[in-house]
Amino acid sequence: MIQDNDQADLSSGRRDFIAAGVASVTLAAAGTFSSAAASAADSSVSRNAGLHGSVKALVFDVFGTVVDWRGSIIREGELLGKRKGINADWVAFADAWRGGYQPTMQKVRSGQIAWTNIDGLHRIILNDLLRQFNINGLSEEEIDHFNRAWHRLWPWPDAVGGLQRLKSRYIISTLSNGNVALLTNMGKYAGLPWDCILSAELFGHYKPDPEVYLGAAKLLGPSPSQVMMTAAHMDDLMAAKKLGLRTALVTRPLEFGGKRRADTAEDGEGIVDVIASDFMDLAAKMGT
């Protein structure tokens, strides 16, 4: 059996990371919240007041929106390399692993491969990458453990604190292509205070298929307009908006490490209902 020393180390580091992140967000807010900022915040809350009464639940994209998949996968690769003496470009490996996500998903949609959950898709991509990066000598158990690195992703520093605030007023749930086991394990690992776990797996489709958004809305509210899709990606939000869900863009400029353009506030202007710089900002704009 593989020992969970890496997970224990990561869990400890993750707790320190979250605590430091929440503290820094809190201190920064306290130190810079001038009267002008207070006025702007009050104005923002006022503009969104209509949403506060109508929205009952917020559902969240997870990869990139709630958690830093890139930094987490790089670190997991570095731990594996250190343990096994593997010298690899783990930054490139992480980008390639995520980069294979949409093309492999499309093979399911086109019928080239049978329906497969995200753990299965990640494993298909991983098998190819191990060959491409000439990484050898791993047992089946070690490969499976590495594939579950996606269960052990770190949250963005503002995520836990912001979710806790939102939870005080709204139902908060995942709505991710990640499978239920992955999202549940990640939630426990990262300390994410979800009220429930909703996954595309439950509907036999991947986002942005309509069945995912409408399925979640049916479970959480009498109408789609009572559910707010929250994501860092405009394609996700546009798909939800077309089906009547409310939408919130939370910008994550560092999702791709600055190597690829992330969606910005300007992309969402006049399209989404709420634009926030992070989850603490979103909580404030949603009246919590």
Report each predicted region and the residues it spans.
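Alpha-helical elements of Rossmann-like donor-binding domains used by nucleotide-donor carbohydrate transfer enzymes
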Residues: 16, 75-79, 96, 124-128, ...
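Active-site neighborhood of HAD-like aspartate-dependent phosphohydrolases
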Residues: 45-99
